[in-house]
Regions:
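Exported/periplasmic ABC-transporter solute-binding proteins
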Residues: 2-97, 102-291
């Protein structure tokens, strides 16, 4: 996540003591939210003096780069990005690396649904899987669908996961897999959108589609079916209450002192506009917009 070359010399005198360029990097789950808000913020104001009369007349540049939660934290730690985006809890070691100016901004709550293709005949047999069965499926210990339910065909179970740099991989490992490793035959996906699309295109697929990605995939037609986990459904109410346990925060962090311009954009993220974008992307807002 390196800063783009263009606009670096834009109003250089003003940039000596004013930050006109802001860079976010990391989680592909948070990426569409921040990217959408960066675009609307830039289109609305164009130059920083339109945001605040005390700011200089320099062009607004808010760059957002996907790369995964781990990449985002690293970029925030080494200073190649102002903010690292995560879709998991931040580790104590990462907080320590970010230093005394560490700050976290939680934008949304997300959960990992255990989703199968909506055409899978399993959906007619049961709407729930227990954690141990899920673990065995993802570990490859249960390899065909007839091992889940004897009435199903002996088709190979195709497992879909996020790539290893994604926050979801760590969340699922901690919440479900424990000491077990995900099967090496699992197909890795570069984003939650891709993961959901992969399951939707495979009648014998299963994967941990994020709540937001699941809702977006099913917006026009139900293509995914989320299994209850130990009888608990991944609903907004159950995620907020914590009853549905396979969940994660969606947030961004920094180790820098937040500049006035960055704070102005953060205020925009946590406004009604930001709230609406979070909802549009299928997530549960973790904030109440300022009046």
């Amino acid at each position: 996540c390196a800063a783009p070359a263009e606009n670096k010399a834009d109003d250089k005198a003003a940039q000596d003591d004013f930050q006109s360029q802001i860079l976010f990097c990391g989680s592909t789950s948070l990426y569409p939210i921040i990217s959408s808000l960066a675009s609307s913020f830039t289109e609305k104001y164009v130059t920083w003096d339109k945001v605040n009369a005390q700011f200089p007349n320099s062009h607004i540049s808010v760059y957002v780069a996907p790369g995964g939660s781990g990449v985002g934290v690293k970029a925030a730690v080494d200073g190649t990005a102002d903010f690292g985006m995560l879709a998991r809890d931040i580790k104590d070691s990462e907080i320590e690396s970010l230093g005394e100016n560490y700050k976290a901004f939680v934008v949304a709550k997300d959960a990992l649904t255990v989703s199968v293709n909506a055409q899978n005949p399993l959906c007619e047999k049961t709407d729930s899987l227990d954690t141990d069965t899920i673990r065995k499926i993802f570990a490859g210990e249960i390899a065909t669908w007839d091992q889940v339910d004897a009435s199903l065909p002996a088709e190979t179970i195709n497992v879909y996961i996020r790539d290893l740099s994604g926050g979801a991989y760590e969340v699922f490992q901690k919440s479900v897999m424990g000491e077990s490793e995900v099967t090496a035959s699992a197909t890795q996906s570069a984003s939650m959108t891709e993961l959901a699309t992969n399951i939707a295109g495979d009648p014998w697929g299963i994967g941990y589609a994020g709540f937001g990605a699941y809702n977006k995939a099913n917006a026009e037609k139900k293509v995914l079916f989320a299994m209850k986990v130990d009888g608990v459904e991944a609903t907004e109410e159950n995620i907020i209450s914590g009853v549905y346990t396979i969940q994660r925060p969606v947030m961004f962090v920094t180790g820098k002192v937040v500049s006035p311009s960055a704070q102005a954009f953060i205020d925009y993220i946590f406004s009604q506009t930001g709230y609406d974008v979070v909802v549009k992307n299928g997530y549960i807002p973790a904030f109440t917009p300022a009046a």
